[in-house]
Structures are given as C-alpha cells and as structure tokens.
Amino acid sequence: MLEARLEQASILKKVVDAIKDLVQDCNFDCNDSGIALQAMDNSHVALVSMMLKAEGFSPYRCDRNIALGVNLTSLTKVLRAAQNEDILTLKAEDAPDVLNLVFESSETDRISEYDLKLMDIDQEHLGIPETEYAATITMPSNEFKRITTDLMAMSESVTIEANKDGVKFSCQGDIGNGSVTLRQHTNVEKPNESIEIELSEPVSLTFSLKYLVNFCKASALSNTVKICLSNEVPLLVEYSLGGSSYLRFYLAPKIGDDE
C-alpha cells in the first residue's frame, strides 16, 4: 500500500509540466525512501531523473516496492483539477490498476478525488555513474532560462565553456553569432542571485539548445540551478525540490559531426 501526502500539489504539477514534453510514459518507482522516476527521451539524447524523498511527504507510507506506470499527458489532465495550494494525497494498492489522487482545498471544504488508470511500462534502469565534474556552476534558474532562450533565437547549438575567468555560453547561427559571459559573484542580500563556479579544470562542450530550453521549464521549481560539466560526459542540470529531493536532467554533448 502506498499513501503519500504532499502539503502543496504545485510541486508534482510543476515536475510533470517540466518533463512531459521529453517523456510520454514512465514509471514512478515507490519504495520506503520515496518516489523516484527515471526515463530517457525518445531520441535517447536526454535522461530525466527525479527523487521525491519520503521526508518531503507528511505522512509517507509505502509497504513494498511499487511501480506506477503513468502516461504523463493523462496525469497532467488530472493534476489540472488541483489548485497549487491544495493538499495532494497519492494512494495505490500493492498491485495497483489505478493511482488514486485526492486534492483537498486548504481554504474550503472541497475534496476532489480521481482514479488514474495505470499502464504496464517496461523500463530499463540505467545506472548513472557518480561523476566528479570538472566544472560546477550554480546560478539563478531564471538567468539560465533567459540565456538559453535568447541564444536559441540565433542557433540550434550552444557551446558552454568554463575556465578561471568565468563561464561563457556562445552560439553561431545563420544570422550571426552571440555569447553571454558570467563571472562568479556573491550577492549577500539575495543569495539566490549569486553565481558560483567551482572548477578543477577548464571544460568546453556543445549541446542542443532545444533540450536546454526544455529543461528550463523546471525553473518554476527552484530559484537556483546547478549545471555540472566534464569533457566527454553528459551535462547535468539539477533543480532542488527542497531537502534532498531533486529533479535532474542529463544531456549528451554534441560531438564533431553533429554540431
């Protein structure tokens, strides 16, 4: 039996909004430590990994491991019925056919209840190796969103280059080229607006802007974003969901010919 109560439905709504254009069907894997999701996009270029830790729910109960196979378009339709401030409870039996969602209004006595039919989804689990990244950039999530959106008007690809001087996002397109350079700076009054760059060695990689713009839909979940780079390994873009819960996106770099 699974029973998981979220104080704010908005968290799940925003997570699903952020990933539904990348992934159509996926398993929510529930166990006693929380609810996890891992899925590749159709072209196998990007990977989504989410963890909602048990301590983010109150209460949280999961007696045995359950995989909830969900179509994200269908889940979006059900979640539209929830107000952001609603209390959301997820329930499922041990061998479930449906996921039960209950939305309770915190202001009125309204309770909405929906059953979402589940699917059998065969999903391979990819072991994501722990990587020591050459560069880790922590920056305001809306700034990262703006940079990717601005550069996408010029080109399909962006080169992200981190060195001791800062981090540079640059692109070249048919109409010209453009770049944005950020240097480390600390904003004491508004720490969320600080830019931190940790660097063990210089790194320069090229990525598809279409995917990065897509990842930035998760900006609604967190004020800051962490971008981790190493030569020849996928980029990691991580948004915190509070506590040790997270939403992570991995993106393979473009190599030589496909730039």
From Swiss-Prot:
- Reported modifications of this chain: Monoubiquitinated on Lys-164 upon DNA damage, and then polyubiquitinated through 'Lys-63'-linkage.
The cross-link described as Glycyl lysine isopeptide (Lys-Gly) (interchain with G-Cter in ubiquitin) comes at: K164
GO molecular function per UniProt: DNA binding; DNA polymerase processivity factor activity
- Alphabetical list of CDD domains matching this protein: PCNA
Q: What does this protein do?
A: This protein is an auxiliary protein of DNA polymerase delta and is involved in the control of eukaryotic DNA replication by increasing the polymerase's processibility during elongation of the leading strand. Involved in DNA repair.
The subunit field of the Swiss-Prot or TrEMBL record says: Homotrimer.
UniProt protein name: Proliferating cell nuclear antigen
| Organism whose genome encodes this protein | Chaetomium thermophilum (strain DSM 1495 / CBS 144.50 / IMI 039719) (Thermochaetoides thermophila)
Q: What is the lineage of its organism?
A: Eukaryota, Fungi, Dikarya, Ascomycota, Pezizomycotina
